[in-house]
A protein has these predicted regions:
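Short, glycine-rich nucleotide/cofactor-binding loops
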Residues: 51-61
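Short, charged/polar "capping" segments at the starts of alpha-helices
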Residues: 23-29, 88-90
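Short acidic low-complexity segments
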Residues: 37-48
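Conserved class I S-adenosyl-L-methionine
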Residues: 8-21
Length: 144
């Protein structure tokens, strides 16, 4: 069975950011992450290749988007985790297709969905200029 890190396209980056995660969140078994520096806050001086941001609602998406994009390397891997509809933490304005205006307005669109656990899903965002199969759904004014 693939680990969450494998599902999230982790490629051996030495330093990553995992922002706003719940205290009980486990990214991977300890043996798998012991050589990775995991920042729980974005270091404004560090450009990240791999970043995971947890958002309980669209206001948290709005809050974390500017610093996440500012510190994401060109075509870095950016995941936003959000509560599943079946979770008690679910927000009516945040799901796979809604609540991502802050990212969409900056030309970042959801390209891949991954199951994190029973309460969370993760949506990978990528800048439109790196999306090979850009279709009409990525045109300006279309919120995902």
């Amino acid at each position: 069975m693939r680990t969450l890190l494998e599902k999230l396209n982790y490629k051996g980056q030495q330093r990553i950011a995992v922002i706003n995660a719940e205290k009980n969140f486990r990214l991977a078994p300890v043996r798998e992450i012991k050589k990775i520096q995991i920042d729980k806050e974005i270091d404004p001086r560090y450009p990240y290749d791999f970043m995971i941001v947890f958002a309980k609602d669209s206001s948290e998406v709005d809050e974390f988007t500017p610093s996440a994009l500012h510190n994401l390397k060109v075509d870095g891997i950016l995941w936003f985790c959000y509560p599943k509809k079946s979770s008690e933490k679910a927000s009516p304005g945040l799901d796979r297709d809604h609540g991502w205006k802050a990212l969409n307005d900056l030309d970042f669109f959801g390209i891949r969905l991954v199951n994190v656990d029973e309460n969370w899903s993760a949506l990978r965002f990528r800048n439109i200029k790196f999306i090979k199969s850009a279709s009409d759904r990525f045109k300006p004014g279309k919120e995902l």
